[in-house]
Amino acid sequence: MIVRETRERPLSWRERVKTVPSWSLPFFALEWVWEWLAFLLSRWAFVVLLEYLGSLSILVAVFFYFHDSDNRVKQRHYQAWQVINTAQGKGGSGGRIEALQELNNDGVPLVGVDVSSAFLQGVHLGKARLLRSDFSAVDARNSDFKNADLQDSDLHTANFRESSFHKASLAGARLDDADLEGADLSDTDLSGSVLDNSDLRFAVLTNSKWRDIRSIKGANVYGVRTPPEGFLEWATQNGAIQMKADIDWAAARPKR
């Protein structure tokens, strides 16, 4: 809102001369000219109109900023997908950590995303919708996949050491040769998953849904923490191994 102050009419030159010392007249003359100019402009309707138009332009700019916010979000998402897709099949991060996290934070489904062979260490993808995604050969150590949906995803030969899959769904996922040492698989759905030759040493399996695991041949379950009742017996009966040292495990697991 514009608040206009009514300017008082300046003194005439004759009156002004009487109020200042004669030696300072040149300085006050310039000030007197500006006072009169300001007074005359304040009474000009066109100047008032310009002031209102200036305020209106600010309001219009604010309106269009918020009105166009959806387009800016779409553009941001498009750029994030470009980063992911152009780096497909390549090593390194290539900005994919930030791109994946941004899309997930905005609630964008990541169904079928292909980040195979990428370096994604420390990525935060809690609650991500990652059905049928390809994380094969990914290095995602110390990452967060809590409550994520990774059903029917390809995670074989990936490194998820010390990562959290608490309450995540790995149903039907391919996890053969995956490194899950020290990973948190508590309350995780492993139904139908393939865990052949996976490293489960010191993994947390509290309350995990393991009974319908498809295959666990050659997997190392040494030191598994809080395993569900009956899990270790079932695992060893179905080809799992309990070996602390890598060299012993390599010698004991089935040859391909």
Where are these regions (language model features)?
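N-terminal capping/linker segments that flank leucine-rich repeat
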Residues: 1-116, 220-256
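Tandem repeat scaffolds
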Residues: 23, 88-91, 100-256
